[in-house]
Structures are given as structure tokens and as C-alpha cells.
Amino acid sequence: MARVKRGVVARRSHKKVLKAAKGYYGARSRVFRVAKQAVIKAGQYAYRDRRNKKRNFRALWITRINAQSRAEGMSYSRLIAGLKKAEITLDRRVLADLAIHDKPAFAAIVAKAKDALAA
């Protein structure tokens, strides 16, 4: 079997990793062995946090909705129950946006939820 000289392939592979590690601190951006580990770990963090981001935003939306709905005299859980009963299908992202930027519209939605719970 012929000998395989890896010069070009190895150089390309190293360049790819070092380019991905650009901006990292110290040896993590300069030494291939360390940079490779850093890039792999960064990928793991990115994968994990793309999922956590969804949870964090949902929690933020719920906090905002709860704060505004309490100002309107209703707890978050009662509001969601009222919306389900009134068959209003607005997701939490939209509700949170209304709670922050369009308080009169949010107040109208809370009023409808209250009516649905009273009925």
C-alpha cells in the first residue's frame, strides 16, 4: 500500500478549526490541540443553549403577562384559564408583546377572560 502524505489535508483541517476558534483567549485560539477542544465545547454549549433559549423566553413572557394581568386585577393562571374558556388563542409571545406595548388591548383581553370565567 502506498504511503499517504497528509500535508494538505492536515493543514486544511487545522485551518478550519483555528478559524472557528478565532477570538478565543490565549492558547485556545492558537494551539490546534487546545483549539479543537474549545471548538467542540463551544458547539456543545451552543446546542444546549439553543434549547434553553426557548425556555428562557417562555419564562420571560409569562413573567411579563403575569405582571400586567395582576395590574388588571387577575392572576396569570386565571387569565390563561379564562382565555381558554373564551376560546381566545393568542400565544404567550403575543400576549407579552401586548402587555408591554399595547396596554389598552391587553386590558380588553383580560376583560374578555374575566367575562368568560364569570359565565
Swiss-Prot record:
Task: Give the record's keywords alphabetically.
Answer: Ribonucleoprotein, Ribosomal protein, RNA-binding, rRNA-binding
Has UniProt tagged this entry with the keyword ATP-binding?
no
UniProt-listed InterPro entries: Ribosomal_bL20 (IPR005813), RIBOSOMAL_L20_CS (IPR049946), Ribosomal_protein_bL20_C (IPR035566)
What is the top-level taxon of the source organism? Bacteria
Q: Which family does it belong to?
A: Belongs to the bacterial ribosomal protein bL20 family.
Q: Which PANTHER family did the record assign? A: 39S RIBOSOMAL PROTEIN L20 (PTHR10986)
Its biological function? Binds directly to 23S ribosomal RNA and is necessary for the in vitro assembly process of the 50S ribosomal subunit. It is not involved in the protein synthesizing functions of that subunit.
Name the chain's protein.
Large ribosomal subunit protein bL20
